[in-house]
Amino acid sequence: MTCWLCVLSLPLLLLPAAPPPAGGCPARCECTVQTRAVACTRRRLTAVPDGIPAETRLLELSRNRIRCLNPGDLAALPALEELDLSENAIAHVEPGAFANLPRLRVLRLRGNQLKLIPPGVFTRLDNLTLLDLSENKLVILLDYTFQDLHSLRRLEVGDNDLVFVSRRAFAGLLALEELTLERCNLTALSGESLGHLRSLGALRLRHLAIASLEDQNFRRLPGLLHLEIDNWPLLEEVAAGSLRGLNLTSLSVTHTNITAVPAAALRHQAHLTCLNLSHNPISTVPRGSFRDLVRLRELHLAGALLAVVEPQAFLGLRQIRLLNLSNNLLSTLEESTFHSVNTLETLRVDGNPLACDCRLLWIVQRRKTLNFDGRLPACATPAEVRGDALRNLPDSVLFEYFVCRKPKIRERRLQRVTATAGEDVRFLCRAEGEPAPTVAWVTPQHRPVTATSAGRARVLPGGTLEIQDARPQDSGTYTCVASNAGGNDTYFATLTVRPEPAANRTPGEAHNETLAALRAPLDLTTILVSTAMGCITFLGVVLFCFVLLFVWSRGRGQHKNNFSVEYSFRKVDGPAAAAGQGGARKFNMKMI
C-alpha cells in the first residue's frame, strides 16, 4: 500500500512549482500573482513597506498610519497603475513623490490630513484619470495645482475646509469630465476658475453655504451636461441668467430654500431631459412653468410643499414619461394640467391627501396601465373610501364618487352698490358644486382678482369680493366666475363710487383725486368710440364748408370775366412834357 502511494504521488512531484514574485511579498501584506496586486489594508503601517514586487499594478495601503510621502517611497514601482492611500494620517506629500509612476491611472488620497497641495506634487502623472482628495483638511487650491494632469477625467475634492479656489487652480485639466465640490466652506463660485474646464460634463455642488448663483458662474462651460446643486440652505432664488450659455440634459436643484419654480432660468434649456426640484419649499406650480422644456422626460417635485398645480402647469411637456409629485400637500391633480397624458408612463402621487372625486377620474381610468413605481396612491377623502388605493377601487364606485357637478351660484339677485370714495365695498358670491368650485372675480378693467391677488381688491374665503378704499375709477360691472372640473357659472354686480363731498376734502386730496381720475385706465371700446366721434365731427365740418361754398358760388349768377380800363396821363408843364403828350390810353384786363 505504501509503494502504491509513492507511485501515485510521483507525478505531483514532477509538476513545476509556480514561480514566486520577483521581489517577494512584504510580511504584513497579501500578494496576488495573477492580478499583480498587493493589499496591505489595516496593518498599522507608518510608511510604505519595503519588498513590494516591482511589477505590482495595484497597491492597497488604505487604513494605516502613514504620515508622509517622500520622493523615494514609491520609486521602485514603475508599473503601478492604481494606488490607494485612503484613510491614513498623511499630512504632507513631498513634490516628486509620484514622479516615478508614469503608468499610474488611479490615485486615492481620501480621508487624510492634507491642508495644502504644494506645486510639483503631481508632476509626470500624465496618465492619471482619477484623483480623489475628498475628506481632507484642504483650505485653499493654489494656482496650477493640477497643471500636469492633462489626462485627468474625474476629480473629487469634497469634504474639505476649502474657503478659496484661486482663479487658475484648475488650469491644465483639459480632459476633466467630472468635478465634485461638497461640504466645503466656499461662499461663492468663481466663474473664471471653472472656465478652465472646457471638457467638463458633470458638476456636482453639494452642501455649500452659497447664497446666490450669478450670471457668469457657468457661462464658460459649453460642454456641461449634468449639473447638481444639493443642500444649499442659503439659496432662495435661481436668477434668470444663471444658466445662460449651458445646454444641460440633466439639472438637479434640491434641498434649497427656493420658493418658486425657476421658470425664467429654465427658459433656454431646450435640451433638458431630466429635472429634479424636489425638497424645496415650492407651494404652487403656475401655468406654463415648463413650456420651453420640449424634450423633458422626467420631472421630480417630491417632498416639497406643493398644494396647487394650476391648469396647464405642464404645458409644453410633450415627451413627459415620469412625473414624481409624491409626499406633498396636493388634494388633486387634474388632467388639464398636462399638455397630454398619453405619453405618461410613471406617476408618483403617493403621500398626498388626495380627494377622490371626478378630478382624479383620468388616473382611475388608467390605473391598470399606469406605473406607480410600487407606491400606490390612496384616497384621503371622502370618508367612505379613505385609505383605499386607487388601483384597487372597483368600477362600481366610479359612478358614485367620480362624477362632477357643475358649479351653481346660489344668490342670483343683482347687487347694485353705491358707495362714497374711501369706503370699503363687498360683493357676495357663494357657489356650490362637486368638487367645491373656486371663485374668482373680473373687474370692469378686465383684470382678474383671485384669493392670491395683491392690491386693494381681493377675494375672501367663501368667494366674497372686497374692495378697500373704493375710488371713482372702481365704478363699473364686476363678474363673479365660479368654476370646477365640471364647468363654470357667472354672476354680475354693479358698483358706483361717488366722489367724497368737497367739504370733507382738503385741497391736496382734491388734487390727488383729480390726478387719479386722469390716470384711470381707458378700455379699448372707449378709445375706439372717442376716435370715431372725432373723425365724424371733423368730416362733417369739412363737408358743411364745401356745401356753403358751392351754394354761394351758384347764387352769384353770370359775371364778366373781361373789362376795359381807360387811363389818361397827368399833364406836366415844360417842353419835354409837351413833346410826350399823346392823349388817353386804353387796355383790357381779364379777371381770373
Curated annotation (Swiss-Prot):
GO terms for cellular component: extracellular matrix; extracellular space; membrane. SMART domains: IG, IGc2, LRR_TYP, LRRCT, LRRNT. It is a single-pass type I membrane protein. The keyword Aminoacyl-tRNA synthetase does not apply. Disulfide bonds join C429-C480. Residues 25-531 are extracellular. PROSITE patterns: IG_LIKE, LRR. Residues 352-406 form the LRRCT domain. Residues 25-54 form the LRRNT domain. Residues 1-24 form the signal peptide. The chain crosses the membrane at residues 532-552. Residues 407-496 form the Ig-like C2-type domain. It is found in: Membrane. Keywords: Disulfide bond, Glycoprotein, Immunoglobulin domain, Leucine-rich repeat, Membrane, Repeat, Signal, Transmembrane, Transmembrane helix. This is Leucine-rich repeat and immunoglobulin-like domain-containing nogo receptor-interacting protein 3. The lineage of its organism: Eukaryota, Metazoa, Chordata, Craniata, Vertebrata. The gene is LINGO3.
